[in-house]
Amino acid sequence: MTFVAASITDNQFDVAIAGGGVVGLVLAAGLRHTGLKIAIIEALPKEQALTKPQAYAISLLSGKILAGLGVWENIKDSIGHFERIQISDNDYRGTVPFAKEDVDELALGHVAEHPVILQALENCVEQCPRIAWFRPAELISFTAGENHKQVTLQQEGREITLQTKLLVAADGARSHTRSLAGIQTKGWKYWQSCVAFTIQHQAPDNTTAFERFCDTGPMGILPLPGDRAQIVWTMPHHKAHTLVNLPEADFITELRQRIGDRLGEFHLINARRLFPVQLMQSDCYVQPRLALVGDAAHCCHPVGGQGLNLGIRDGAALAQVIATAHSQGEDWGSLAVLKRYEHWRKPENWLILGFTDLLDRFFSSHWLPAIALRRFGLEVLRLVPPAKKLALRLMTGLLGRKPQLATGQSLVSQ
């Protein structure tokens, strides 16, 4: 049986995406040239979604995917780019420097504020007449048909029913769609929370990112345009709750004690945000006519800024699997096809989840052998170029299978 795209005159869709955030829109944008009819179901009004005061580390691979989607040119002048990374540890006197030359790239990574990247992706998908938005709308339930899922939404007090050959959960770590599907997760909550905020500073150089490890948790400093920096400060829950509620002057004093004078004079330019840290992996990423992407499938420790990047890779990989199946006349919602996505992404995500968990535990340990071992490890990274390059390729996404979108090729069904 050959599966063809749905007509554009009814509530029948080829792909319905629950969640119109960055990951869901990467998937939709990746499919926009395939001829498939796509529904995006988003609970937040557009104005509210675009006010999220958050910034993300964007890896080299994610940047290449965004370029393949055609949105990079629209955001590259509005985001931060870092050419160097300095890694340091409380129990190590020096720093381990990484540079763009270590991977022969123009930068080591990028930093994008949520409204910038989300608006660019929204503009991209809104140009496609075969993509329909249901917003604000909530997915209430879904049932399985022979070759489709029937999805019930609530929008403006009324219920709407859609049919789709594939439902994709891109609705975050507390995914309602995943819960309705009965998919269990494994993982744990860390003993830490993160305090995230943005500062304005006077450092002469704004092209260096910093990752500072200590026994209470890591701190990441990421450069933003306009002499700004996004800081994610990880620490035990009680300390994080105390810091987020300190008067601003006292908070600045605590921060200066941690980062020293590397950024010169600085001040806060937005509110401090507190969020807990967890590791989570779904037992499965797919069921017949259902797939999970992004935080709906997995969550990791924020050290290294990997979370959103894993989701962007999920979206690009699933788009490729769907487009390939469609071009070959296969049922892109079948379990056999969707397993190709799971077999691609789940092991790679496990690798990063395990690596970030190891980093946090290893650099937080007071055990003397662990302290000695991490000193040795940092020396190896500093002095052995192949080890440095391998670590960089892992954290920038350049190690492993790359989605077609990352090569600059659009996904077009034949």
UniProtKB/Swiss-Prot annotation:
GO biological process, one term: ubiquinone biosynthetic process
GO molecular function: FAD binding; monooxygenase activity; oxidoreductase activity, acting on paired donors, with incorporation or reduction of molecular oxygen
PROSITE patterns: UBIH (PS01304)
Superkingdom of origin organism: Bacteria
Pfam families the UniProt entry points to: FAD_binding_3 (PF01494)
The protein's required cofactors: FAD
Family named by the database record: Belongs to the UbiH/COQ6 family.
Protein name: Uncharacterized protein slr1300
Organism: Synechocystis sp. (strain ATCC 27184 / PCC 6803 / Kazusa)
